[in-house]
Swiss-Prot record:
Lineage: Eukaryota, Metazoa, Chordata, Craniata, Vertebrata
Keywords: Hydrolase, Repeat, WD repeat
GO molecular function: diphthine methylesterase activity; protein methylesterase activity
Pfam family, one: WD40
Protein name according to UniProt: Diphthine methyltransferase
EC number of the protein: 3.1.1.97
Gene3D superfamilies: YVTN repeat-like/Quinoprotein amine dehydrogenase (2.130.10.10)
Annotated transmembrane regions: none
PANTHER family recorded: DIPHTHINE METHYLTRANSFERASE (PTHR46042:SF1)
BP terms from Gene Ontology: protein histidyl modification to diphthamide
């Protein structure tokens, strides 16, 4: 059990993903918010798959899991309903709105492609994800990230449906999605960074603007109507920028994270100076704003586990970000983390606590594929912004990259299950920035290949749905 003045964190379930897990995403679409997807990445070394001539490249294996959450199954709330083997999954996102009546999941994979899968509802409330379209961006690189332009869950009628993606060559790719057929069309590709472009993300309030972060330590903004020159370049992070998310609740608010072990909060109208800077003692691979509480930010901090951050005073009063909850997982790297869109009314049940000094997670007996690590090469580039101080610990940049980059360990070496009924309250249309008693979240970790389901219990009784008239006294709907 991990606790803080803000509440208690309990682990409800641990699932062995067999391959190393790096991405986890709760479905945001109303009616399907009990579904959870998890993506994995595993490098198969030549000794595991020998080539006759010794020249066959190493294989990046992947698997996509689909789970259904049920509060009634207290022993195992997550039920696996599908698994699909594929190329390694490096990022994935659900589209926040149905497309032609269907729920879509987008994947960025190790074959350099973006793929779309359609959620199919079968008999007995069963679900499967079926491929519907794919677009190869570059066969000689990895697709490292992707984002939908629908992050606010609402959009202006004239706005097209778009995807932005980044790759291991430092390029960005803008794609258009045909809303009738779900076919993908490449609109533009352009060089954005000197080395790996770890992350690309939309400004959800003005989707012509996108942001990117790279292994060259740069955070950049782009206007997709006038490509060629970035709108801004910031080097406030002193190591590779690997996570970015625009706030879906407050215009102009942007969160970024880096291998420098800092989370920065920005007002995009003044990109020279961040609103706040909080050290998190781990490289920040993912950042996720809470779907309801405007000020809560979830950070996957690699070798330092994950943290829940309160950004309210930083945004409203230009004060520091507060770390509400921190959970370390010393035997692995946390790459994936996401908030559930469900408010759930689980009654107190016997749950086992997560001891930070003893992992205590007994997974099924599966052999673990080993990966080796090699730090990428880096460079410096002058920009308009001053450089910030380095991380508080004594690690050099090369040491950190060697320890934090299993996803790219080989980059420089090679040229029908039914879902249970769910008793939940849909909060996707609620507003207000106050805490509520229970939140569900999921994380996935790399070396121990485990997906964790957590319940964060806060001790504060505050108004959740200000002015919406929703009644949280009952969870039935």
């Amino acid at each position: 059990m991990a606790g803080s003045h803000a509440g208690t964190l309990r682990v409800l379930q641990a699932v062995d993903t067999e391959l190393t897990a790096d991405s986890v995403e709760w479905c945001p679409v109303e009616g399907y918010q009990h579904l959870l997807a998890c993506g994995t990445y595993q490098l198969r070394a030549p000794r595991d798959q020998p080539a006759l001539d010794g020249s066959e490249p190493q294989v990046r294996l992947g698997r996509l899991y689909l789970f259904s959450f049920s509060e009634h199954n207290t022993a195992k709330p997550l039920l696996e309903v599908q698994r699909r083997d594929s190329s390694a999954v490096l990022d994935m996102k659900w589209c926040h709105i149905p497309v032609s009546g269907h729920v879509l999941l987008g994947l960025a994979n190790a074959s350099g492609s973006i793929g779309l899968l359609r959620l199919m509802e079968c008999e007995n409330n069963s679900y499967t994800l079926q491929p519907i379209s794919s677009l190869a961006l570059d066969e000689n690189c990895l697709s490292l990230s992707m984002d939908w332009s629908t992050g606010k869950s609402v959009r202006a009628r004239e706005q097209p449906l778009k995807i932005i993606s980044s790759d291991s060559k430092g390029q960005l790719h803008l794609l258009m999605v045909n809303e009738g057929t779900a076919e993908l069309q490449l609109v533009a590709s352009w060089p954005a960074h000197h080395f790996e472009a770890w992350i690309a993300a939309f400004n959800y309030w003005q989707t012509e603007l996108v942001y990117s972060g790279g292994d060259d330590c740069l955070l950049r903004g782009w206007d997709t109507r006038m490509l060629g020159t970035p709108v801004f370049t910031s080097k406030r992070h002193c190591m590779g920028v690997c996570s970015i998310q625009s706030s879906p609740h407050q215009e102009h608010i942007l969160a970024t994270g880096s291998y420098d072990e800092h989370v920065l909060l920005w007002d995009t109208r003044n990109i020279r100076q961040p609103l706040a800077d909080v050290p998190v003692q781990g490289g920040v691979w993912r950042l996720k704003w809470h779907p309801v509480h405007h000020h809560l930010l979830l950070a996957a901090c690699m070798h330092n586990g994950f943290k829940i951050l309160n950004c309210q005073k930083a945004i409203e009063e230009k004060q520091d970000i507060t770390v509400l909850t921190s959970h370390e997982m010393p035997n692995s790297l946390v790459y994936g983390a996401d908030w559930s869109w469900l408010f759930h009314s689980m009654k107190p049940t016997p749950t086992w606590f997560f001891d930070q000094n003893d992992m205590g997670v007994k997974a099924a007996d599966h052999s673990s594929l080993k990966v080796t690590e090699e730090p990428p090469i880096h460079s410096q580039e002058q920009t308009m912004d001053r450089q910030v101080e380095g991380p508080a610990n004594a690690h050099t940049r090369a040491e950190l990259k060697a320890s934090l980059l299993p996803l790219t360990e080989d980059m420089k070496n090679s040229k029908d299950c039914s879902s249970s009924s769910v008793k939940t309250r849909d909060l996707s249309h609620c507003s207000g920035g106050q805490s509520f008693d229970n939140s569900l979240l999921a994380t996935c970790s790399f070396y121990d290949h485990v997906l964790h389901l957590w319940k964060w219990e806060t001790n504060q009784a505050r108004t959740l749905c200000s002015g919406t008239g929703c009644d949280l006294g009952s969870a039935d709907h």
